[in-house]
């Protein structure tokens, strides 16, 4: 602790531990859900937080809150980040530290840029400054972040593949970047996606909250043309006027699909071939998401509900499921009063009243209320029929079409059920007839 005495004999004290204690207390309140006035939903996972902390750490949230003027019960859903990435970003806001896997370092920095987090944005800029075109073509080694820990700080990292990044007074000397970027593959420029991101981020820096559509012809042609050299182009040379539109003012109060829909994945994850799940035909932009999804088809469900024995792959999904047993439905429709357990379910329902169709097909003019309907529609454009009947090998583009086909054409159970119902009805009629006959006989005996 330091203190100063001025000429007027006024004593001033500086509490060096205040910042640490302040952050620790705020983080404890967040983890306990105390005084949280905002909930962020990412991939159906809800994160409670304090609005003032989000606005102080992120220029994106600051502009978003000013535009929406949300109240204390607001829930905001963002669909351009992975839930695990946002969880680490949120932990950084409250602890000034980030733990990130090496393969997710680039994604973490891109997410930090979009959210307007100064520390992650600076890391991304330092990483770009260190890399050079000569290194891109001569070296095959990967980027490596070397973080200098403060003396005496324990190492809680259990996985050697996790890098812990700390914001220590924003000192550039604490963070160094070693290694060289990966070599170019198939003639593609490794900076192409980054330049596209920079151009989009420049648009996101405006005062209005914007919605990004990255499936424009200019972007797609640049990413898919292997022989075209974009090294000499600058971010300012890329235009996205046709693909960027402002969020409509008549959007439902208290709700927002922040900064774009599923098309924003084109920017955030880069242009990649879609990976298809062999079990259900659902497509994914990277293998990590596919592996996470494949757990749904396996028996590995360690989180079991004690009330109905239903299993789940994550603890967050189990918590959402438990709301069904309690009957607690905190999300109510302002139009008809219908209540829902989850925020995404309410959002889907509200589109019934507003007729909002935010999911537009980039191949035609059709738009849809739900993302799943858009995916089914896009499969028809591509001619994909991933859902195959196990009895006759007939293929379908939608899972519902396959189920309908199996019920109509191969449902032996349905035929047995129908036969049983007919037999049961016949037995009931026979029993009723026998009862009437017995009553008539009793009446005859009584009269005689």
From Swiss-Prot:
Self-association state and partner proteins as the record states: Interacts with ZBTB21.
Biased composition (Polar residues): 416-425
Protein task: Transcriptional activator of the dopamine transporter (DAT), binding it's promoter at the consensus sequence 5'-CCTGCACAGTTCACGGA-3'. Binds to 5'-d(GCC)(n)-3' trinucleotide repeats in promoter regions and acts as a repressor of the FMR1 gene. Transcriptional repressor of MYC and thymidine kinase promoters.
Keywords attached to this entry: DNA-binding, Metal-binding, Nucleus, Repeat, Repressor, Transcription, Transcription regulation, Zinc, Zinc-finger
Sequence motif Nuclear localization signal, location on chain: 50-66
Domain topic, free-text comment: The BTB/POZ domain seems to direct the protein to discrete regions in the nucleus.
Domain BTB positions: 36-102
Swiss-Prot/TrEMBL GO biological process terms: negative regulation of DNA-templated transcription; negative regulation of transcription by RNA polymerase II; regulation of cytokine production; regulation of immune system process
Annotated Gene Ontology cellular component terms: nucleoplasm; nucleus
Biased composition (Basic and acidic residues): 404-415
Compartment annotation: Nucleus
ZnF segments: C2H2-type: 275-302, 303-330, 331-358, 359-386, 387-415
Native source organism of the sequence: Gallus gallus
Biased composition (Acidic residues): 156-167
Protein name, as recorded: Zinc finger and BTB domain-containing protein 14
Family: Belongs to the krueppel C2H2-type zinc-finger protein family.
Gene Ontology molecular function: any one: RNA polymerase II cis-regulatory region sequence-specific DNA binding
């Amino acid at each position: 602790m330091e203190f100063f005495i001025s000429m007027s004999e006024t004593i001033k004290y500086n509490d060096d531990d205040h910042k640490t204690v302040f952050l620790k207390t705020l983080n404890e309140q967040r983890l306990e859900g105390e005084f949280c006035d905002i909930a962020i939903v990412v991939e159906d996972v809800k994160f409670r937080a304090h609005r003032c902390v989000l606005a102080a750490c992120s220029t994106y949230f600051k502009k978003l809150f000013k535009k929406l003027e949300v109240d204390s019960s607001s829930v905001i859903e963002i669909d351009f980040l992975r839930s695990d990435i946002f969880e680490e970003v949120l932990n950084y806001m409250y602890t000034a530290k980030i733990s990130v896997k090496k393969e997710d370092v680039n994604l973490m920095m891109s997410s930090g840029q979009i959210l307007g987090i100064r520390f992650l944005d600076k890391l991304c800029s330092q990483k770009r400054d260190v890399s050079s075109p000569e290194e891109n073509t001569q070296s095959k080694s990967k980027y490596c972040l070397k973080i200098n820990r403060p003396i005496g700080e324990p190492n809680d990292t259990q996985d050697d593949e996790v890098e812990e990044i700390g914001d220590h007074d924003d000192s550039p000397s604490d963070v160094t970047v070693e290694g060289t970027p990966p070599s170019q593959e198939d003639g593609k420029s490794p900076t192409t996606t980054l330049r596209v991101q920079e151009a989009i981020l420049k648009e996101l820096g405006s005062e209005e909250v914007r919605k990004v559509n990255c499936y424009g012809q200019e972007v797609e042609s640049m990413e898919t043309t292997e022989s075209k050299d974009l090294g000499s182009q600058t971010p300012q040379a890329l235009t996205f006027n046709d693909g960027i539109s402002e969020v409509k003012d008549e959007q439902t109060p208290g709700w927002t699909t922040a900064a774009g829909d599923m098309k924003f994945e084109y920017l955030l994850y880069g242009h990649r071939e879609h990976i298809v799940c062999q079990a259900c035909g659902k497509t994914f932009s990277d293998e990590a998401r596919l592996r996470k999804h494949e757990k749904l088809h396996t028996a590995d469900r360690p989180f079991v509900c004690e009330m109905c024995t239903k299993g789940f792959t994550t603890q967050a999904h189990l918590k959402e499921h438990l709301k069904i047993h309690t009957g607690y439905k905190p999300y109510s429709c302002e139009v008809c009063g219908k209540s829902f357990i989850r925020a995404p379910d309410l959002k889907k329902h509200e589109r019934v009243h507003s007729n909002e169709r935010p999911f537009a097909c980039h191949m035609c003019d059709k738009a849809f209320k739900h993302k799943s309907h858009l995916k089914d529609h896009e499969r028809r454009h591509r001619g994909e029929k991933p859902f195959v009947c196990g009895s006759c090998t007939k293929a379908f583009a939608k899972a519902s079409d396959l189920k309908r086909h199996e019920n109509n054409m191969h449902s032996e159970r349905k035929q047995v059920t129908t036969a049983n119902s007919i037999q049961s009805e016949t037995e009931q009629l026979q029993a009723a007839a026998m009862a009437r006959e017995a009553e008539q006989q009793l009446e005859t005996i009584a009269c005689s």
